[in-house]
Structure formats: structure tokens, C-alpha cells
């Protein structure tokens, strides 16, 4: 999915940012994705049920900010993106039912 390629542009260090979305057992990730200790996650809910995780990580250690190396605005952004992904799935499911 192209969305994983767009997400890093919203973070302070886009060139050092990688993303993984795990949604209903499927993984979508940036080409540079790897597990690191410098990460934020947000649960993806579909109709109130947990269906996946959005993870944004830095590839290298960064200076401490509000939440580890991340700003509060980045926490807000990851939460909004996870909510958006959940709502898109809900819409897709609703259209299939029609």
C-alpha cells in the first residue's frame, strides 16, 4: 500500500523513519523497515475491535522529546492515522455489504 510510503513525511526525520502496518494478519511496510527501540505504535480499531497496529520507528537514536524521540504532535498524528485506517476498513466492509 502506498500509504506506508507517505507516512514518514509527517515525522521530524522522514529520511530516518520507517513504517509497518499490520492489519488483519497482513503486513505492509516501507522498504527500509526494521525493528528498533525508537518507535511509536497505535492500535487500529475497526467497529471498536482491535484489528491491527500502525508502527512508526526511527532507524537511529534521536534526541529525547515528549515521548522518547517523538513530539506530542507525532503521537497525535499516528493516532489520527490509525483511526483513519480503521474507518477506511469500516467503509470498505460497509460497501461490500450493500
Question: What do the PLM-derived regions correspond to, one by one?
Answer:
Residues 35-44:
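A short beta-strand signature within small-molecule sensing/ligand-binding domains used
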Residues 1-30:
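Helix-loop-beta substructure at the N-terminus of cytosolic sensory domains
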Residues 69, 93-98:
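Sensory-domain boundary/capping and coupling elements
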Residues 34-35, 57:
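A generic structural motif
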Residues 1, 71-74:
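The cytosolic transmitter module of two-component sensor histidine kinases
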Residues 44-60:
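Short hydrophobic/glycine-rich mini-motifs in sensory/regulatory modules
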Amino acid at each position: 500500500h502506498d500509504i506506508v510510503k507517505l507516512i514518514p513525511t509527517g515525522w521530524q526525520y522522514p529520511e530516518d523513519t520507517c513504517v509497518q502496518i499490520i492489519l488483519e494478519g497482513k503486513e505492509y511496510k516501507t522498504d527500509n523497515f526494521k525493528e528498533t527501540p525508537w518507535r511509536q505504535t497505535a492500535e487500529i480499531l475497526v467497529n471498536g475491535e482491535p484489528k491491527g497496529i500502525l508502527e512508526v520507528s526511527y532507524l537511529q537514536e534521536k534526541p529525547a522529546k515528549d515521548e522518547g524521540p517523538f513530539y506530542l504532535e507525532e503521537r497525535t498524528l499516528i493516532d489520527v492515522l490509525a483511526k483513519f485506517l480503521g474507518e477506511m476498513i469500516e467503509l470498505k466492509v460497509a460497501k461490500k455489504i450493500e
